[in-house]
Amino acid sequence: MIELRGLSKHYKLSGDVLVKAVDKVDLTVEEGEFAMIIGRSGSGKTTLLSLIGGLTKPTAGSVHVDGVDLWSMSDSEQSRFRAEKIGFVFQIPSLLPTLTVLDNVKLPTMFSRGVDKVGEKALALLEMVGLSEKAHAYPSQLSVGQQKRVALARALMNGPEIVLADEPTSDLDKATELEIMSLIGKVHEEGPRTLVMVTHNLELVNYATRVRTMDNGVLSKSAGQ
């Protein structure tokens, strides 16, 4: 379960201009739920996702994941907790160009023991996203849609209970968009995993179990399914 209470992130610009990227957000995402946050570019949804995942420190408020306050931990404790509990799918896949597709998927567990099992799991995840034949290719040899599928496989490498996805279908044609959403739906259902996705695309709302809208840093009280 994810619980946000009074969560805010404010930035001060030159001339003492205060930007409320996220402002007083209250949100509970139940275990196994697929929550989707819809908003235009600049609405604060990516910042909110970063706050949920512990990548950005809030100005005020709290983030609890499975009852644990993320910001009550030391940096090392938080990093360990995040690595074990949360998988991230970023808008830009950011695959390392000098590593093969397989090694990119293995990155979250690169220093784990049992290398053979790590390799087997990475191959199984590539099979799941339909890219096992690209295991020894390099990111530059993949389309944007294929890179996003690799990023999804990488996010699942540690077996996270929670997946946070930032605009995973951006810059894709309709057919590839549907492929990615079908995979995300599969990830949610087969876990079952708690999934929070942010997007500007209203056409995707039917994939979620609950939908909220965001504008100017404020999350709607109700826009749900």
Each language-model region and where it sits:
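ABC family nucleotide-binding domain
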Residues: 2, 8-25, 29-214
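H-loop (His-switch) and adjacent beta-strand-loop-beta switch element
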Residues: 211-223
